Amino acid sequence: MTPLRILISNDDGVLAEGVRCLAAAAASRGHKVTVVCPDHERSATGHGLTIHTPIRAERVDELYGPGVTAWSCSGTPADCVKLALSELLAEKPDLVLSGVNHGPNLGTDVFCSGTVAAAMEGTLEGLPALAVSVACFQWRDFQAAAELAMDVAENALADNWPNNLLLNLNIPPCHPEQMGSLRWTRLSIRHYEEQFSRRVDPHSRTYFWLAGEVVKDLETAGDGPRDWPSDVAQIETNSPSLTPIQPDLFWRGDLSALPAACVANQPVR
């Protein structure tokens, strides 16, 4: 295919092996790659933006291989993409990629994900965008995930990539020969048992570490094709999951079920 201009970001930081592997995979296919990533890990920052302190960026091409321009940015993942599109790139990219994330981004966890937020920032700017994650925090072989992400992105661009569509790709922690087939999936709803570890610092001030674990994965976060598995169920079969996401969060349920009292007897203005 014609070489693409690709912007890559993440939330694990510019030194993370996952993003370096993804950048190398894109560059090896002849694409023009620019990496703009946080200067340190910014996991679970969601779509947060930096508005009260300056954002700084510096070139770090030496961290990446040939054909990759790289920037280290002091901001959040969403900041990185915003800054790249507004200030750092000479031309608008054809594609925004985010990842490869060191850990899953499944179900309603996408609302907390810096990885998904970086891709969503591209979607909000009218660009095709894909987030890619390996569904295990301990897995360190990102080559298969990077290559599959590139295959999915290139195929989607060659076929039909609708406006306002973000593709969220999760890949099981196994080698390609052990992996099942890629399928379209729906978002699950993840419920956690929230836990806070209470501690005391040397100045006798109490502080907390947030912890917790998934206690329940519901089948779906909303209506959708019934023959599509949830993303969590797909990963549990050692098969990659591809979930279409959009920025429009409008309620798609029964409008007659909305609490009518909210707007009853309100004066017309």
Swiss-Prot record:
Cofactor note: Binds 1 divalent metal cation per subunit.
GO cellular component term of the entry, any: cytoplasm
GO molecular function: 3'-nucleotidase activity; 5'-nucleotidase activity; exopolyphosphatase activity; metal ion binding; nucleotide binding
Reaction equation(s) it catalyzes: a ribonucleoside 5'-phosphate + H2O = a ribonucleoside + phosphate
Compartment(s) of residence: Cytoplasm
E.C. numbers: 3.1.3.5
Keyword Transmembrane attached: no
Entry keywords, A to Z: Cytoplasm, Hydrolase, Metal-binding, Nucleotide-binding
Annotated residues for binding of a divalent metal cation: D11, D12, S43, N101
Domain of life: Bacteria
Cofactor(s) named in the record: a divalent metal cation
Entry-linked InterPro entries: SurE (IPR030048), SurE-like_Pase/nucleotidase (IPR002828), SurE-like_sf (IPR036523)
Signal peptide range: none
Pfam families noted in UniProt: SurE
PANTHER family found in the cross-reference section: 5'-NUCLEOTIDASE SURE, 5'_3'-NUCLEOTIDASE SURE
Protein purpose: Nucleotidase that shows phosphatase activity on nucleoside 5'-monophosphates.
Family under the similarity heading: Belongs to the SurE nucleotidase family.
UniProt protein name: 5'-nucleotidase SurE
Taxonomic lineage: Bacteria, Bacillati, Cyanobacteriota, Cyanophyceae, Synechococcales
